[in-house]
Amino acid sequence: MNKITFMGVELEEQGPSDLIVKALGKSIKLMDLETFIDTTGFEKDPIMNDYFWQIMVTKQRTHLSAMLLQCLGYEGEFRVQQQHFKRFLKSNNIHPLELTSSDPDIKNYPTIQDEMKLLKPNVISNRKWLIVEPREFKKVIMKLNTKHGDRIREYYLCLEELLRLYLEYCVYFKEREAKLQITTLEQKLEQMNITMIEMKEEMNLSMEEHADKLDTLVDQNEELKLDVSEANEKLETVTHKLGIAVEDRSPRLEQKPLRERFVLFKRNVKNARFQYYAIRGQSIYVNGRLTLYNERYPNLEIIIDIFCQPNPRNLFLRFKNYVKDDERFNFAGNNVECDITYESIMKEIFEKLNEEKRNV
C-alpha cells in the first residue's frame, strides 16, 4: 500500500482516522494544540500539566520547589528531599544551578519569591534554590527511580502520541487547504469563462438591437416617403398614360451589386421567439449582412430571395400593413415572429405583394 510520509508521520492512503476527521470537521481554521486536545478528548492530568507539560514546551529553566520534588516522588522535609535529589543529580552527571537570595535572577522565579515570604531572614540568607535547564530536567524524568517515575514517564509517552497525532492533523489540514485553494481557483476560472460567454452574447444581442433600431428608423423614413408619394399621386393623374413595360417602369441597374434585393431568412435557433429576419437593400449590402448572420447562425436558411425588387423596403412595409391584424404574425424591427406551420402562407403573401409591382 502506498503511503504519504511527512516528518516521519505516515499518512495512510485510505485517509485520516476517525479522530482526525473529527478534528478536521471542528473548524475550517487550523486549531492550536490546546483546542486540539479539547476536541480529541485527550485526558489531562492537572499536576502533570502544571509541571511537566510546561517544561516540555517552554525553554525556561525550572525551579525545583518543594511541591515539584513531591511530584517527582521525594518525601519528607524539604531539606531531606533536596539532599536526596542532589545525590541523584550527581550520580547521573547532572549539574544544577544554585541561586542564593542575593542573586538577581531570583526575580524570574515566582515560586522562589513565594517560598521566601514564608521563611525567616536567617534561613533565607543560608538557603540555596536548585535550578535546572529544560533538557537536564527531561533527563531527570527519564532516569527517575522513585514511585512516581513510571507514572511521569507514561505521561510523557502519552504526550508524544498526542504530538504525533497533532502533527498528522496539521498535515491533513494543509492537504485539505491546498485542495480547497485549487477548487476555488477552478471555480473562479469557470465563472470567468461563463462571464465572458455572457458578455459575448450580450454584445451580439446589443449589436443586433442597434441594427434593428437602424432598420426601424429606415422603415419610418420609408413610411414618410410613402405618405409623400401618395400625396403626389393624388396630384398626378398620369397613371393611365403609362403604357410602358414593367422593366421600363423599374429598369435594372447594369451593376449587379447595386441592384435592389429583398431576403427573408430563418435563424433555426432553438427556443428563439423571432425565427425570421428581413434584409432589404442593394445586393452588395445584403451579401455583407448574410455573411455576418451566417457566422452567427450556422443553421441559417434563406426562405425568400427576390432580386431586382424595385423597392425592397416598400415590400416589407406593405407586408407588415397587410398582416397587421393577423395574430399569426408579430414584428420587432426587421424580426418576424411566425409559427413554422404558417411559413408557407407567409411566403405566398410576400410573393403576392411582389407581383403587384406589375399592376399598372
From Swiss-Prot:
Which InterPro entries does the protein's record reference?
A: DUF3627, MSV199_dom
Recorded protein name is Putative MSV199 domain-containing protein 212L
Q: Which residues form a coiled coil?
A: 173-243
- Keywords for this protein: Coiled coil
- Biological source species: Invertebrate iridescent virus 6 (IIV-6)
Q: Which domain of life is it from?
A: Viruses
Pfam families from the xrefs?
DUF3627, MSV199
